[in-house]
Amino acid sequence: YVREAYLRGLSLEAEYKINPYKFGLVGASDTHTGAISDKESDYHSKIGILDGTPELRGAAPVTQSLRDQLEEAGANVIVDGFLDIEGKDYIDTGYTEWGASGLAAVWAENNTRESIYDAFRRKETFATSGSRIKVRFFGGYGLDAILDQEDPVKYAYANASTMGSDLLQNNNEAPEFMVWALRDVKRAPLDRVQIIKGWTELSGKPHEKIYDVACSDGRKADSKTGLCKDSRAKVNLNNCK
């Protein structure tokens, strides 16, 4: 829905000259406990007493005593019913769909409140689903020399627009982009980096196209589709590794 909002914003701007969906991105927990769980292995709850145990989240079988208490209390806020799985009772609840939080990542000059809030205001931020990946993105013109620089990031700040800011049209010259991504060493490797282009026709009709700009294992994007073939990496559904 974020990408849909961006496209709607472009359509509204084409029609009304204003874009109410010109926002940056951060990740967060949305918990109601005052505490955060940013790892699935350490996830304890989202709303406290209602889902504060594995049993209440449908992750572990309930005892007969707990089932009796829930049925007597008419706790339909928690329980939609019970499921019999291999002879054991599990709570059937929407809380099974909740999990560890995302993270807000901010490119700030210093680790101070002032610098961090300045980065929020200029939207030089990004969101992750919990892994501590790092992503930088710059756009500009004539950026070919950036790869020859001793400090490409410093050069990009001086000669390009940062993520979240506006990149103005330069006559008919096509913009160039610098993307830098670093995996979380404690999580799975990165499969690919994508740039998603959104634009509108003069009528305001929106369009979207996805480009794979970097892929793992030496894979190259197809010249027609702009996408790489799927990697051979698989996920073990028994342990999610």
Positions of predicted regions on the chain:
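C-terminal functional module detector
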Residues: Y1-K241
